[in-house]
Amino acid sequence: CGYPPLQMTNIGANNLSNIISMGFDVEVFTPAPQSSAQLSLASFRQFGNVSKTAEIALYSAVPRIAIEKKIPLILWGENDAIQVGDSEAAGKNYFDANNLRNLNTLTEGGIEWIFNEIGIHKAQSYVYPDKRSFDKAKLDIMFLGPAWDDWSLDENSIYGALTGLTLRPDDIDITGD
């Protein structure tokens, strides 16, 4: 899931091109620009968070696409229960990511307001698949973090930079990470 076109940076576009040049199949899903702008404003007014709907779309897109394309396994990066302390996302073990649907990002405030803001049809991209859809598709999500002894934001940034990722030049005080 990417940012809406007006929020995409040259660094982000170059990093995406780099991943493709490494031989990865890449499928890009981006929210519609006008709907995204409308939802960002509504999200800011209601939650004080301009990025809430972008995060909802990010978390929801991956399993929706996997179910649609009959991909049985998603390898997810960070374990939100460990990395950011969202215990509702904790699974049966450190690798189990099947409780992402319980993340505060996806549950806090619901999504009815999104339907009201842009309509049911346009809001489907913001709906995280329910457990029944997961079970029917036999979809499993696993966190990658526990497979690496040195999983951290710093180590991941170093590894990414050494393998072709272009990092943002701004200071952490500006970017937040």
What are these regions (language model features)?
Residues 2-177:
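Nucleotide-activated chemistry modules centered on ATP-dependent adenylation/adenylyltransferase
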